């Protein structure tokens, strides 16, 4: 089976740079026998930075490059020369990426906008040179500060796709067919369940050049919230959606019951998903005549807008777009302006997280060695502990 290009989980090891050490150099020039201290400060270690990039929509580019190292700051030198700052390491991620501590499961941050930057690990501050420590009674300090140590962290990046409308339904409900009908997306379509194995996004064109984004996820089956089928892994991709479009085939024995099963699975996975706007689409309605549609109307849920559609004949497609646009632009669900649905992030269960990574082949042990250098064995003296005060004055 070919490996999927859609990667929404990745585990990476990050390490910031350590600060360069300050110089304890004493000025020595011809005709200047007592030049005094002139050691410069060490440079700052490089940060590890996360940056949102709308040109990415999966984490595939990080799957095979999972060791992220920023560079160390340079050491201070004579003539109050400051060390060079370490180079920051920027990790480009798709908008909608959530970051967790891989060891504790603790939520760290969330990237939701293009160009948004968050410092994941700060580089160590550079050590102060000896000229900072000169006083009236200590005019030739022969010591300096070392740089602050680096930081390291194992993190898990989890992608939750950003879309306005999320399609929810059982396998073979016609979700992919609808997406291919209303957008330029071309998901795989076939007459058997679980044709869709990964999420798909499509931009739906509306009137007067307006548009909205629709997300199709693999079909949900009863018990998906307990780990059955593919639905559980991909349910998180509709957590950010402003509106959920439930799709139930018209030839189903009990449309209301199937809708309630889907609703229950979402509630079990995340109760907050029930607060989202909902629309019910009865698909494959080209197989229903007007008399049968009239008989089904009284049996449909009362608390949700519904419409009969057919992606094959185009029945009700434009009306569906109108309903979706109206619901998206309600005061409680404004589409224009802020398009990102705010969600509450909770700490992850580490055991479940590791199990899911194992199922995806992402549980390999990371082997990395700390490279020692001359600074690690350097013997520093400390006679001034006012690190923060001195650093703030710079």
From Swiss-Prot:
Pfam families: GTP1_OBG (PF01018), MMR_HSR1 (PF01926). It is found in: Cytoplasm. Residues 163-329 form the OBG-type G domain. Residues 361-394 have a biased composition (Acidic residues). Mg(2+) binds at residues 176, 196. Residues 4-162 form the Obg domain. GO terms for cellular component: cytoplasm. It is an enzyme of class 3 (hydrolase). GTP binds at residues 169-176, 194-198, 216-219, 283-286, 310-312. SUPFAM superfamilies: Obg GTP-binding protein N-terminal domain, P-loop containing nucleoside triphosphate hydrolases. Gene3D superfamilies: GTP1/OBG domain (2.70.210.12), P-loop containing nucleotide triphosphate hydrolases (3.40.50.300). One of its GO terms (molecular function) is magnesium ion binding. Its EC number is 3.6.5.-. Its cofactor is Mg(2+). Monomer. Belongs to the TRAFAC class OBG-HflX-like GTPase superfamily. OBG GTPase family. An essential GTPase which binds GTP, GDP and possibly (p)ppGpp with moderate affinity, with high nucleotide exchange rates and a fairly low GTP hydrolysis rate. Plays a role in control of the cell cycle, stress response, ribosome biogenesis and in those bacteria that undergo differentiation, in morphogenesis control. PANTHER family: DEVELOPMENTALLY REGULATED GTP-BINDING PROTEIN-RELATED (PTHR11702), MITOCHONDRIAL RIBOSOME-ASSOCIATED GTPASE 2 (PTHR11702:SF31). This is GTPase Obg. It comes from Phocaeicola vulgatus (strain ATCC 8482 / DSM 1447 / JCM 5826 / CCUG 4940 / NBRC 14291 / NCTC 11154) (Bacteroides vulgatus). The lineage of its organism: Bacteria, Pseudomonadati, Bacteroidota, Bacteroidia, Bacteroidales.
